[in-house]
Amino acid sequence: DRLRSRGLGDVYKRQHYNGLLFERLGKKLYLTERGKLLLPHAREMIRQFQQLEELMQNQGQSSTLKLGSTLTVGTCLTPSIILDLQKKIPDLDVYSFVTNTQNIEQKLLRSELDAAVVEGEIHSPDLVVLPIIDDCLVLAAGKKHPFYRRGRIHVQELNNQKFAVREYGSGTRQLFEDYTLRHDLKIRTAWEANSPRALLNAVLYNQMLSVMSIRLMHHEIRHRSVRVFCNEAGEWNRKFKLVYHKNKFLTPAIFELEKILHTYQQLELPSVMGVLEQE
């Protein structure tokens, strides 16, 4: 009887979904291609149902926000953003997850995060991307590097220089690698890290060059421990973006998050910077 009822259930599922969602091999179930197609939508429906229950049943009690940030954003902005959020919504419980753009994108697609603020490019058409906060990369040189006392550098002078760079999957690395390809540069990757602070230390103490967000170096620029060079052609200008799933149920916390991000929109630039020339 158990085998018969299981068989009838399989027939029903095949008819209802126009095909099987699972294949049974021995004692294990495996997703079919049709099942894999349904899975992210099912996860999002479950997540939306949980959020609706929270709104309806827990009025006046704490709400939650699972917020993703890429490493640059997580280092220089996320702590302040969370403080601002909790001032506006005192009972908000925020879970913060910081990693590179590639990992954040996958977590949003699997409904493991409610929203994220990223610096890199998002590729999935299932995610809504709202560019909000101005940012730019700059070339950084420490006091012991020959570039430190220069006012202008030509792009071709970057050839054969030792660089400290971010890991694969980073939006910062992708932007810089695209730049080196456009200008046919052959740099020497001597230091690779997923920590902006580790890259900055390589610049300060190991005579490396690095390209990173100017927002990460306000203290070092003020104290003249690094010299930064802006990209004359604006090729390193970018936006930090609010990202969430297109089917996401937008909670009051997400709406408030968007408002807060606009208060960080403008970029503070130092009065004195070097220039990286293109021609």
Model-derived features: where do they sit?
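Short, small-residue-biased leader/transition segments that mark boundaries at the very start
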Residues: 1-12
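A short LG(V/I)-centered, amphipathic sequence patch enriched
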Residues: 14-31
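Alpha-helical linker/hinge and terminal dimerization helices associated
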Residues: 16-17, 38-59
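Central regulatory/effector-binding core of bacterial HTH transcription factors
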Residues: 62-125, 193, 276
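A late-sequence structural motif
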Residues: 77, 227-271
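Hydrophobic hinge/microswitch elements
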Residues: 100-105, 109-113, 118-119, 175-228
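Flexible hinge/capping segments at coil-to-helix
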Residues: 124-163, 168
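Secondary-structure junction motif
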Residues: 147-148, 161-183, 214, 250-258, ...
